């Protein structure tokens, strides 16, 4: 049996959630697994449809970390475990086991100045696991520069689930939403400084003069949502930008299919970097 420890898992939405779901689902086809994940209000129906066991841990964040670790440590003591796979070094920080440990790295969570407390904590975990799975060569080089043992790092690019054939009704709905709009630009991602929605909106102000029917479709949610909408209003681009949130995967995929260009000019913002832009792969 393998244990999967994650802080991001469906039915919550996002790239990391999709990644951890895909990893767990595929692993369950070859091994018995148990997933320890964060509590989500709508988790019951999702969990009941899964072919593997999922244990949800809720409560106040600062206490949840310790409660989750205690549950996992007890489970390891009482069961025959082959190994532990974690989405983040923090997920392994309090786990006590001599079994095989594998930790994924993505970039942002390890990008701390050498010698700082966070850097030392990350290295304390990553240099004591069996394998560090890097999502890209960029992330591997970043990890090495931060002090991670190069010999432990293996690069495995994240995969995506094949998209099912889109139904005609959803495609028709997306076409109606975008009627008479051209060209059609789209970004599917969290509203985060790193994703650089602001740059696209600033560019849109100039493109509007050349393409009066241009539209920019934003699908996602996040901390920067209000700032992005405020900028759109300040530049009088309400008619050129469409915001979508909490929509079905079918509609999201249909909007991508009916768009002309997928745009996401990511930048480095403080310690936040794009280790592997899985959104580009999903769009392709």
Per-segment meaning from a language model:
Residues 6-13, 19-64:
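N-terminal strand-loop element at the rim of the active site
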Residues 138, 159:
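Carbohydrate-associated surface elements
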Residues 165-179:
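A short helix/loop element that forms part of the nucleotide-sugar donor recognition site in Leloir-type
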